[in-house]
Amino acid sequence: MSAAADVPRRVTIHDLQLRKRQHRRWAMLTCYDALTARIFEEAGIDVLLVGDSAANTVLGYPDTLGVDVDELLILNRAVARAAQRALVVADLPFGSYQISPRQALQTAIRFVKRAGVQAVKFEGGRRVAEHVRTVVEAGIPVMAHIGFTPQSVHALGGYRVQGRGDDAAAIRDDALALQEAGAFAIVLELVPAGLAAELTAALQIPTIGIGAGPDCDAQVLVWTDMAGLTPQPTPKFVKRYADLRTVLHDAARAFAADVADGRYPDAAHSY
């Protein structure tokens, strides 16, 4: 049997769209390195998003606006090399696609060719519909992102729920425009649960919720939030499934104490 026969079949955008029709929900996590990519795959995570949230969680920026293409390419390469089954999606950073559809295509091509990802994601509604169309027509799947869009945090007046009251119509129009442009899925961030449910029922493509209630076709979290590595407080929508911050703190503290007291390395850990 060839080695290729042992490689698991990769999740595709068509698989995700089929799951919507079958009412089968799925999970996406952010991921920034090879080790966690392998762990998340083994745990059954279907989509790995190499998010621009790496700016905060990995690279120490105060927000997502400062990270650039070259920095994210390194992280995308690591995840794409490790992931054999999960669909890997590259989050395009601020300033790398907004100028024109041509710029969006050029950046998307860089991530597909140089990092080996299977799809790209960028933020915005109707204003980026032509960008989506151009990239999709070139053969690169695009995941859209509407509602609260972190790259527009200053224009939106800070981190707050989008689509309440009269603003709901604009969110609906954005979603329909992006679907028509060819997006294979849409992230709904900080959108009222009722509106997210309405959009999920109306759209033919999957919706991915983050702070958008329980009725989306899928859910996504930043993995450091999900695993309890991020300092508290975290947003209301975050459920902490572990307390890795305490685990790592205690492990590092114990290591330092063992070294200081001469307990490590002992005979069992020496050659």
Curated annotation (Swiss-Prot):
Cell compartment(s), UniProt: Cytoplasm
Enzyme class: transferase
Active-site positions on this chain: E189 (proton acceptor)
Pfam family, one: Pantoate_transf
SUPFAM superfamilies: Phosphoenolpyruvate/pyruvate domain
Catalytic activities: 3-methyl-2-oxobutanoate + (6R)-5,10-methylene-5,6,7,8-tetrahydrofolate + H2O = 2-dehydropantoate + (6S)-5,6,7,8-tetrahydrofolate
Keywords assigned: Cytoplasm, Magnesium, Metal-binding, Pantothenate biosynthesis, Transferase
Reported cofactor(s): Mg(2+)
Cellular component, GO annotation: cytoplasm
Signal peptide (from-to): none
Role of this protein: Catalyzes the reversible reaction in which hydroxymethyl group from 5,10-methylenetetrahydrofolate is transferred onto alpha-ketoisovalerate to form ketopantoate.
Assembly information from the UniProt record: Homodecamer; pentamer of dimers.
UniProt protein name: 3-methyl-2-oxobutanoate hydroxymethyltransferase
Organism, scientific name: Acidothermus cellulolyticus (strain ATCC 43068 / DSM 8971 / 11B)
Name of the encoding gene: panB
